[in-house]
C-alpha cells in the first residue's frame, strides 16, 4: 500500500473549526510538521478538506 507524507505549510488560525480539527486528527500541530500515513480513502478525504494548508508527497 502506498504511503503519503503530509506537511503542514499554513496555520489553522482563523480557519473554520472543521479545518482546525482535521489538522489535529491528521496529527499536525505546527507549521513544517510532517506525518506519514497509509493512502486510504478516509485519509484522502481529510487531506482534501485542508488541501490549502498542507502539501502531499508519495513516499516509497
From Swiss-Prot:
Transmembrane segments: none annotated. Keywords: Ribonucleoprotein, Ribosomal protein. It comes from the Bacteria. GO terms for cellular component: cytosolic large ribosomal subunit. Gene3D superfamilies: Ribosomal protein L30, ferredoxin-like fold domain. GO terms for molecular function: structural constituent of ribosome. InterPro entries: Ribo_uL30_ferredoxin-like_sf (IPR036919), Ribosomal_uL30_bac-type (IPR005996), Ribosomal_uL30_CS (IPR018038), Ribosomal_uL30_ferredoxin-like (IPR016082). GO terms for biological process: translation. CDD domains: Ribosomal_L30. The keyword Ribonucleoprotein applies. Belongs to the universal ribosomal protein uL30 family. Part of the 50S ribosomal subunit. This is Large ribosomal subunit protein uL30. The gene is rpmD.
Amino acid at each position: 500500500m502506498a504511503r503519503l507524507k503530509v506537511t503542514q505549510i499554513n496555520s489553522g488560525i482563523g480557519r473554520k473549526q472543521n479545518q482546525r480539527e482535521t489538522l489535529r486528527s491528521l496529527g499536525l500541530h505546527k507549521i513544517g510538521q510532517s506525518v506519514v500515513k497509509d493512502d486510504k480513502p478516509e485519509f484522502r478525504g481529510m487531506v482534501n478538506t485542508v488541501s490549502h494548508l498542507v502539501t502531499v508527497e508519495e513516499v516509497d
